[in-house]
Amino acid sequence: DILNISRGGVGFLSRKRLEVGSYYDTRISLFSREMIDAVLEIVHVEEQEKGYYYGGEFIGISDSDAVKIDIYQVFHDI
C-alpha cells in the first residue's frame, strides 16, 4: 500500500522483507490510471505491527513520469 509519493520517491507498506540498498523495477498505478515505471532504491525500513514501512528513492525517473506524480499530488492534496 502506497502511503505517500513524490517525484523523489515513495513511502509504502509491505509484508515482504526488503533490504535497504536493494533496487527494484517498479510499476506504480496512480488514481488516474497513469502508470509510473521506475527503478526504486530502498533507503529506509521500519518494522511495524502488520509488516514493514519502506522509504524508496526513484532512480532515473523520466521527466514525463515526474510530471504525472506532480499532477497526482495536486489533486491528492485538495
Regions found by a protein language model. Name each.
Residues D1-I78:
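Structured alpha-helical
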